[in-house]
């Protein structure tokens, strides 16, 4: 979120639960604490707001993954597993969509409709010195802090400042 928005998060609010997945599992007598559904809202320094709508048991729906970005000029949506990219522009009030082809070998090589494959390729090129590093350790640190803050917001039912997790 923060890399796409180009700003840092300042606060998060969330509602989440463990309602379907892993409930029948037990490790050392404890049920896993994996949240399998959530709504998470981040507010950013530049005034932007981002929402994560997570449901890890929505496989039998038309679009089991929907990624959206909304701005002053319109909206773009990425719909999986159909691999549709749809753009709606306020300038002409038209929706334009296209289906992005992903080779079967790539889908079979990783998860997330081929994204895992491309991430692994980029990482390998960076390790070999053939390309710049796309994400840094600092990006990873901030991503983990965002996850920790979101978990706190959900489990404590409150707004969490990113300062509380060291950002």
Over which residues does each language-model region extend?
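C-terminal helix-rich "cap/oligomerization" subdomain common to oxidoreductases
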Residues: 45, 88, 122-167
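Hydrophobic alpha-helical segments typical of transmembrane helices
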Residues: 8, 65, 93, 119-123
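Glycine-rich Rossmann NAD(P)(H)-binding loop
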Residues: 53-57, 70-72, 163
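Active-site loop of classical SDR/Rossmann-like NAD(P)-dependent oxidoreductases
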Residues: 108-120
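Rossmann-like dinucleotide-binding domain that binds NAD(P)(H)
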Residues: 1-62, 138
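Mobile, glycine-enriched helix-loop/loop "lid" segments at the mouths of ligand-binding/catalytic clefts
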Residues: 4, 77, 82-100
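Short acidic/polar mixed-charge low-complexity motifs
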Residues: 8, 46-48, 72-75, 131, ...
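Short glycine/proline- and acidic residue-enriched helix-loop micro-motifs
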Residues: 101-108
């Amino acid at each position: 979120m923060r890399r796409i928005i180009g700003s840092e998060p300042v606060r998060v609010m969330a509602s989440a639960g463990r309602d379907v997945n892993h409930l029948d599992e037990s490790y050392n007598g404890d049920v896993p604490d994996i949240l399998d559904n959530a709504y998470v809202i981040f507010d950013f320094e530049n005034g932007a707001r981002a929402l994560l709508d997570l449901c890890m048991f929505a496989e039998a729906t038309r679009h089991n993954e929907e990624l959206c970005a909304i701005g002053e000029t319109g909206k773009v949506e990425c719909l999986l597993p159909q691999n549709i990219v749809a753009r709606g522009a306020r300038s002409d009030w038209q929706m334009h969509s296209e289906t992005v082809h992903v080779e079967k070998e790539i889908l079979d090589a990783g998860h997330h409709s081929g994204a895992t494959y491309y991430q692994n390729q980029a990482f390998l090129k960076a390790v070999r010195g053939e390309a710049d590093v796309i994400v840094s350790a600092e990006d990873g640190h901030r991503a983990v802090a965002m996850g920790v803050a979101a978990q706190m917001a959900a489990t404590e039912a409150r707004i969490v400042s990113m300062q509380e997790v060291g950002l």
